[in-house]
Each structure stands twice: as C-alpha cells, then as structure tokens.
Amino acid sequence: MAPPPLHLFSPHVPSTSVSPPDPATEAPPAPKQHRGPRPAPRNPGSAKPLTAGVPGGRTRRAVLGIIRKVRSLELSDPRTPSPNGGGGSSSSSTATARVPFHLPIHPPPPEREEEEEKKGIRRAVPWAAARDEETKVVLRREKKTRVPTRAETELEAGELERLRRAARGKERWARAKKAGITDEVVEEVRGQWAKGQELAGVRIVEPLRRCMDRAREILEIKTGGLVVWTRGGIHFVYRGSSYLENAKRHRDFVNYNEELSPVTSNNPTSQGKYWSKDETLTNDNDEADDKDDKPIKGTLYEREVNRLLDSLGPRFIDWWWNTPLPVDADLLPEVVPDFKTPFRQCPPGVRPALADEELTYLRKHARPLPTHFVLGRNTKLQGLAAAILKLWEKSLIAKVAVKVGIQNTNHEQMARNLKRLTGGTVILRNKDYIIIYRGKDFLPGGVAESVIERESQVHDQQAKEEEARLKMADSLQMIVGLSSERSYVGTFREYQDFHDSHARRTTENNFRIQLEAKKHRLEKELKDQEWRLSMLTKKIERSNQVLAKLHSSWSPSKKDGDRELLTEEERRIFRKIGLKMDEHVLLGRRGVFEGVIEEIHQHWKHKEVVKVITKQNQASQITYTSMMLEVETGGTLIAIERFTTSHAIILYRGKNYRRPTKSAPSNLLTKREALQRSIEVQRRGSMKYFAQERKKSIDELKRELRNVTWEIRKLNHDTEQSWTA
C-alpha cells in the first residue's frame, strides 16, 4: 500500500507534462538584481543549490526556509493536471517524480513499505516538520475581559467624553491618606462639589494605590459620585446631575440614623455610614429592591468566605486589596465578659511543637488565603481573640493584616497579645501580616466542653466509688471486728497521692536537670573565655616585645640649655603669623619621625615660623608631641591652638638659626618603622580593651556559676529532707 500523496513534492504524484516555451511569444525575463553573494551553479547531482546563499547551512531552520520558498513557488505557478487523471500507470509510479528540487527522489520499493506498515514504523521525511508546523495550534493567553465601570454604564458617551476633557485640565486635587479614603478626604471632595465644581480629583497613595479598581469602588461608595477618569494615581469623581437632591436625601438619612435607639445600632460600622451592608460586601451599586432579581455572583468558595467573615464581625471597607473584605478588628469589643484562654489537649502520641517541614507547609498554605482581619491597635484584643477562636473551628490559620497609616502600631506587641489570649502559634510576623496557626492541641468549643465534662464525670464517679468503699469497710469492721486502721492500697486516694507526688517529683527533676544543664553550659563558657583571655595575654606580651625592639632603635636628642628668650609681643606676632599661614606640616598616624623633622627644616628655609597640624585628641599626647618637636628641631614653641577637628603647633626657628648639614636626623625612626610602631600600638590597645572585656565577662560567669551551684545544693537538701520526712 502506497503512502498518501503529499502536498509539497511527493514522488507518488504523477509527473506533469511540461511543454517547451515558445521563444516568439514569451517575453525575455528581466535581469535579477542579486543582493549579496551569487549562488553556486545548479547541479542536479549535488546538494549545493539547497544550501547555497542560505544562512545556517543544513540546519533545520535553513531547510524549513527552503521548503517555504518552494511552496510559495508552487502556489504562484500551479501544475497542470496530467491527462491520466491521476490514475497512474506503472511507468509513472516507478519513474522519477518531477520536483522543484534538483535532486532525484525515487519512491521506496513496495516490499519495504509493506514491512514498515506491518511493524507500525513511521518514516521521517524532510518536509514533515514544515507540515506539522502549519497544523500546529498556538494558544495565546486570553486577555482579561474588561468590566465597564459605573460611569461608562450610567453616563452617555458624549457626556462622559466632556467630563474627561474637563478632568484633563484640572490642576488641583485632594490627597488621600495612608489609612485610605478617610472622612477628611470625603469632606474635602464634597466641599469642592459644594463650591460648584462638577469634578473633584483624589490622589491615591500607598497601599490603596496597589489596587486602583478597589480605590474607585471605595470612592464611589463613600462619596456617592462616579469616577469618570483615572490618570496615573488620581481618580476624578463626578458629583452627578442630581447632586443637590442626593445631598438633601443624605442629610435626611443621617438625621434619621441619629434618632435611632442605641439598641438597633448595636454594632456601628464604617460602611454603614455610607452604604448598606449587602451593597458593601458585594460591591453592588444598584437598588436593594432589584437585588433578588439578580443571579448570585461569585463562586461557591467566595460566597462561603463572605458568609464566614460576616459571622465574625463588621467588614473593613477601606481594604486596599480586592474582595473579600476582611473584618475590621478595631470595631470588635475590647473586653469580652468571662473570656479565658481555651482548653487545649494534644492527641496521644503527637508532639505539639511544629517541625521545620510543617512550618514551611503552613506558610505556603497561608499565602493564597484571603485576609481575615485588619488590626490597628496593640492592646485590648479580647474581641479579636474570640473571633479568631471562632474562625479556627473552620480554618487552620488566622491571617491578620496590620493597618497602614495608624500611629504607634507595634506588630510585635500585637502578636504577643494574640498568642497569649488564643494560645496559638505565630508562624509569620512582619510589618504587614501576622499569621497564627491554631496548633495541634486545639479543640473546638463543643469538643473542649465535652472533654471537660467527661473528665468531671469520671472524677465524680471515682469519688462516689471511694465513698462507697469506705462505707463498706466501716460496716465490715463493725461486723467482723477488724482493726480500725484503714488501708489505702488500691484506692482512689492512693492514686491521687501518687499522682501528686509523681508530678512534684517530675517538676523537681525537670528543674534540677535545667540547673545542671545551665551549670554545664556556664562551666564550658567560662573555660572558653579563660582560654581566649590567655591567648590575648600572650599576644599582648608579643606586641610589647615588638614595641620594645622598635623603641630601642631610636633615642631622643638632648635638650639645649642655651635657648633664646622671646618677649610676649614677639610671641603674639609669631602666633598671628602662624595662624594666617596656609602652608603647614601634617602630622599623621606615624607621629614624629625623621621625615617630619626634615620637612620642618624645609619650611624654615624660607620662613621663620612653621605650623604643624596634628589630629591627636588627648592633651597629654599633644603636649608630648610639641615638646618632642621643639627638642628635635631646635626651635622655640610659640603656641598650641585648638581648631574644630585638630590642633596646631606653631614653632619659631630662632634668630640664630643655621640649617643643619644633614636635614634628616639619624636618631629617629624611619618612615617604615614609624608606621610599624603606629600599627603595633593600635593593635596592642585593641587587645588590651578586649582583654578587659574578657575579664569582666569571666567575673560575671563566675558569679552566675556560684548562684547556680548554690541553687542545686539547696534543691538537693530540700529533696533529702522530704524523703526523710
């Protein structure tokens, strides 16, 4: 059985009869303009025409490009059908097919085709990739259908375009707060409308700017207007054509709500001030009468989440993410009567602590969950704790978001108080979210009450059995005349005594183990600190040896007894000259060495006064440096002046000054030795400081070790006395 004919160039397609062209009727072809290298001459017996001039050579991409070009040629010049009508004689089926390629393509023998069909082998052909590429279906990502806004549905196109043109020229707008669209922002918007302006702009800031659609809904709910245009982070709100009638109706509605009794408005919410409860939760802005005629919106999961959050408390309308809106924890009661931390009991054989894998799983599980509560206060969270306990009966995790823009919020204190009130486990806490896991030992309210009730019943039954046993023992003693001494073997009292003593011993043993572990840790740390102190001491001794070697390599000059005397007026003049000088000698970390003395003599070559700048802070160091410079240079110290970040030492060369034959003295350190001395002095000072800190920590560890040893001895003494008693 022959394979089906291929559309491109199949050897099984009957060859078409090609008549030679008539040179008289056919126009000469136009000369082709070659761009780039000319292709090699065609040779039917070689494969060079396939790849000549094609980038990529024989790669799959190049072959596919050749096949596309051949197909375009076939479509532009269709073949004439053969006179045999495709019936196909034996000569046409065995002959070489005429194809656009200059390669002889021969059909496979029929025996080979039958064997391949029996074995189910599909032969790969060069044009199969191109054929599959045409039939390949590419599924593009579908764009999210854009939901029209209220302004686009309620306003006419011409009116909407007019309002948007007016909004483009508006230069002033109100600024929302971090807390969202607050009452101040709403009043500012209505104030602009009251002045006769149709549009009022509101700039949205973080975090509400993350979801501008939600910001638009909040603006329309709270102000009663329509957002007609959005530019960047600014919403432009249209007051509406019937603004005066709506404002009058709003005032009447507010007055009516103020006349209501406090019993009917038991739980005031922020959304009740602007919109009804159903309209707020579903973000539906139509009339309430038409609500029953509309189909139910949202999936089953969304409706269940909304139903659960409705049962926990009032919703937070200024939520900066999409629905469902979380519960506003600040509107929950601060104190709940008879509230206490719930009873917990872990199942047998289960450890209450979370493993690392379990913690990672819970954090991943909490990521896609909706936010349940929004909190803005640090204390008085009993109402929130009661709502979390109710939520835990249907969910493993409670997700609490921290309000943005509220002053003095401390998420660490919030998490600590919630953990103390609920007994849960905080698995994540940051400046945005607090996620609390209910724990493995959590029991729902009904189950906890059943466990407590069952335990009380068992205790009462045991007490009744004990009372009956005692009565029976008394009656037997009266009849038989047994001894009046009562035995507690096998009784409930023996169980209670054993349980109390075992619990006490267990507590004492645990406390003793903790003290022993603390003592072992302190001893180990003390030994480590002493070893570190010994190493520091050895390094300090080694540094002292290096410094002693450096100090032995230089010697100070002798002080000249015959010194020039200067009057106060001369000192004042030289001081003024020295302070006005811009040129100076900078004394760095190396201190006084031969290079400094040489530079001072270079200054004195042209000037009588030299100014030396030093960065030293201690007065003793500055005095020692000035005296050393005076002795080594042979000059006269005029003054020591204090600047903002440094000190200036002014030296006068003297009236009988003579330049020395050797400007660099040989009794001082060289530049390299001075740097080595500076580094070693700094290193020794740091080591002395750390050695002092080590000594303080060692003294503190010894004091703690004495206290722990004394507590262990006292505990052992008390245990011995209890055993003897």
Swiss-Prot record:
Q: Which domain of life is it from?
A: Eukaryota
GO BP field? Group II intron splicing; mRNA processing; regulation of translation
Please note every region of biased composition (Pro residues).
20-31
Q: Which InterPro entries match?
A: CRS1/CFM2/CFM3, RNA-binding_CRM, YhbY-like_sf
Q: Which residues form a coiled coil?
A: 451-473, 508-545, 691-721
Which keywords accompany this UniProt record? Answer: Chloroplast, Coiled coil, mRNA processing, mRNA splicing, Plastid, Repeat, Ribonucleoprotein, RNA-binding, Transit peptide, Translation regulation
For this record, an example GO cellular component is:
chloroplast stroma
- Provide the CRM domain boundaries: 153-250, 352-449, 564-664
Q: Where is this region: Disordered?
A: 1-121, 259-295
Q: State one Pfam family annotation.
A: CRS1_YhbY
| Function according to Swiss-Prot or TrEMBL | Required for the splicing of group IIA introns in chloroplasts, by regulating the intron folding. Forms splicing particles with RNA. Also involved in chloroplast protein translation.
Please give the name of this protein.
Chloroplastic group IIA intron splicing facilitator CRS1, chloroplastic
Q: Which species is the source of this protein?
A: Oryza sativa subsp. japonica
From the broadest rank down, the organism's phylogenetic lineage runs:
Eukaryota, Viridiplantae, Streptophyta, Embryophyta, Tracheophyta
